[in-house]
A protein has these predicted regions:
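Active-site-proximal, substrate-binding regions of enzyme catalytic domains
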Residues: 2-110, 114-116, 123-132, 137-138, ...
């Protein structure tokens, strides 16, 4: 999916991996908030992030990300929304089409219901959202690229964001690099 660094939908329903990727870098998250981006989650995602039993003891990075999410929720961000029967039926239909978790499926269904963007860094989830006719699909690298394009993040922020992201054992650094280059190209084309 090609991204346009000049455009980003401000209201996002985040799936589990997007929650972790946005919160992995305090600098990225702060810039997103300064740019008036809002993130919400479904109750399924909230459960996966904070309460779902894990096979292994959480790593220090996972524990820190859980702490950050709980802190943001206490501040009124990443609000969890319940799904109703219609949403669950949509999830069931979606579930039959792809092998995805309830978090991704509920995020897509809820975003479609409320007409807002779904932010996911899962390729299968993006493909399913696209196949389901949802036009507002975004990723964390797209957010990063847009923040660079808009000047909410500068060149000096790139290594900070990438370092913070890597310290939380998140996998998107190569995609951030590509998104950064796209933002610079888009800025150049706009001038």
């Amino acid at each position: 999916m090609a991204i346009d660094p000049s455009k980003f939908h401000l209201i996002n329903v985040a799936d589990t991996c997007a929650v972790w990727n946005v919160l992995s870098s305090p600098r990225l998250h702060a810039a997103a908030k300064e740019a008036h981006c809002e993130f919400c989650i479904t109750s399924f995602v909230g459960y996966e992030c904070l309460f779902k039993p894990r096979k292994k003891t959480p790593t220090p990075s996972e524990t820190e990300l859980m702490r950050r999410l709980a802190q943001e929720q206490a501040r009124g961000s990443f609000t969890a929304h319940s799904c109703d029967i219609g949403d669950l039926q949509a999830i069931k239909i979606l579930e039959s089409r792809k092998r995805l978790g309830k978090g991704e499926l509920s995020s897509i269904a809820f975003a479609m219901k409320i007409g807002q963007a779904v932010i996911t860094d899962d390729m299968k989830a993006r493909k399913l959202a696209e196949d389901s006719g949802h036009p507002l699909i975004q990723t964390t690298p797209h957010l990063f690229s847009w923040l660079i394009f808009k000047g909410r993040l500068g060149d000096s922020d790139k290594p900070t964001v990438m370092k913070q992201h890597q310290e939380m054992e998140r996998p998107l650094s190569p995609h951030f690099e590509t998104a950064y280059e796209l933002a610079l190209q888009c800025k150049l084309n706009a001038s």
